[in-house]
Amino acid sequence: MDSGTGTSTSCTAVRKDRHLYHDFNLPLPVSATIWGIQVRLDAYADSTVGTPKLCVELSGDGGATWTPAKSTTVLGTVESTYVLGGATDTWGRVWTPSELGNAGLRVRISMVASTLDRDFSLDYVGVSVTYQ
């Protein structure tokens, strides 16, 4: 994966390399109240030049609408774990268990850097949900 065809470091820049992930098979009871969502990324970049980072957005409607983006710190050149969100972070919206099922939940990851020649490696994407 690379940083796309533009040099903007904005998470919402359209000329960035983006990838969708889904089918997390989250076992949520239909009566669950969602308290928070956490996304784990295991990733690195080929260099820190251009301040490479990953931006993550969530969708509960199959990708029709998206949450505001959250971004990692600058990626290092050795694989590390980056965690976005948390046990009490709902990413700016209210979720239902059905939205977090395989038909609804999408994770969109954008590769962002201020240089065009940055290469990214993403080895793991995980989603966990805190609920009652």
Regions found by a protein language model. Give the residues of each.
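Disulfide-rich extracellular domains of secreted proteins
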Residues: 1-132
